Amino acid sequence: MSDASLSFTEGPLFRRLLAFALPLMAVNLLQYVYQAVDMVVVGQVVGPVGLVSISNATNAAYIVNAFVIGLTAGGGVVVARFVGARDVAGQRRAYAATLAVALAGSAAIAVLGVALARPAFTANAVPAASLEGAVGYTVVLCCGCAGPFLMNAAAAFLKAQGDARTPLQLVGVSALVNVALDLVLVGPAGLGVVGAAWATVVAQSVAAVGALVVVRRRFPGGRLAGAFSRSGDVPVGASVIEVLRVGVPSAVQTAVVNLSYALVTGLLNRYGTDVAAAAGVGLQISTIAGLPCWAIGQAITTAAAQNAGAGELRRARDVARIGATFNVSVIVGVQIAVQLLAPALVVAYGLTEPLTMDTAVLYLRITCSVNGLFYAAMYSFDSFALGAGTPRLVLANSLIDAFVVRFGLAFLLSGVLGFGYVGIFVAQAASPVMPALIGALYLRHWTRTRDV
């Protein structure tokens, strides 16, 4: 095991979760800096029309990124189980299968992106002035998604080994490339919104090459020669199916959550450019506020998978309990900071009109408040379920969160009951409550049925 790696099957759990989660928080922040920098640069150079374009396109980007991360995370979970079992050959097979799934997934996303971008944005009521920018951004991102797919596949392998520092270094380089290209392509090169997409694609492709090289050099399980030799007793298809068994529910889970945000954005678009721009900025800020939660969740998934692979079920249970407490505590601090700094954060995104600023601040007042505690709990329990081998629960919870509450309640409150866009904000805040309770019941059932 590399010096940068951590084993969650031994040692103090909280310290190991913290040591693993901190670099992942930085990784997640840097990854979303791509979208944040895109929005800030486009907002300053192109103006409100460009900001609406990229706000809508960013929702599409989140769906693509969510699918990429979710699908490759399935491979990471399978690898982590083999890490816990100390099975290098199994790690090699799982990694090879993950790369194969990633390449197939990138091809599918490219085809779907080109075919569906324009009709999807048209159906979602993107203002005419912003339509071309949103379509162009999305098409470039989808056609160039092989880089992000391969980067996340390699990063999932590294994280399964307990190595969170190497992904941080790679994403750091990628972020610097992205910022530099944004400053050149959006303004001086005259590409506008599409230039921001090209900057992201090139930057992530650079990180992909670096990640693949690092995995091969540092880890025996990352050397693919002989992964599926003819004399082996595990066929290629079986390894691919195992990755897909975890990866598809995980990918669908993350994708449907982001799809629901795109649908909610469609509801908000009907209230005009000011509300749409304000909500886009508010969503970006609340997304960044959720990054620590996601990092801790990734730590929980890896730790749970390693311990499940090693047969340490009692320790896996402790991962869920300690991780959830850790996550909720961190999010309390984040939500307080957002509430105190909301006006300044909104101004940093280039919003200057009083109505737009007030709407964005209201978005944060409602969606970054007490509901964050339920969100942190929901994400922690779902992350444990994924690592422990129950991906279908994660998918079911995401459908409740995304469609039953976030979109369904938003449609009811804003339209049927006449609360307007404020009703949409309230629905977004309420969405994690029910899934958090279901996750808590699952953990209780899991511990009782395994007598731990």
Language-model-detected regions and their locations in the chain:
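Small-residue hotspots at the loop-to-helix junctions and early N-terminal turns
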Residues: 46-59, 134-138, 197, 273-288, ...
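Small-residue-rich hydrophobic transmembrane alpha-helices
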Residues: 51-111, 148-167, 278-342, 375-397
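Short alpha-helical transmembrane segments in multi-pass integral membrane proteins
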Residues: 1-21, 79-146, 177-180, 188-248, ...
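N-terminal transmembrane alpha-helices
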Residues: 8-45, 59-74, 78, 103-110, ...
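Helix-terminus/linker motif at the lipid-water interface of multi-pass membrane proteins
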Residues: 29, 33-52, 121-128, 184-191, ...
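Transmembrane alpha-helical segments of integral membrane proteins
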Residues: 378-379, 405-414
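Transmembrane alpha-helix boundary and packing residues in multipass membrane permease domains
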Residues: 24, 28, 40, 77, ...
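Transmembrane helical elements of multi-pass membrane transporters/channels
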Residues: 19-38, 140, 144, 151, ...
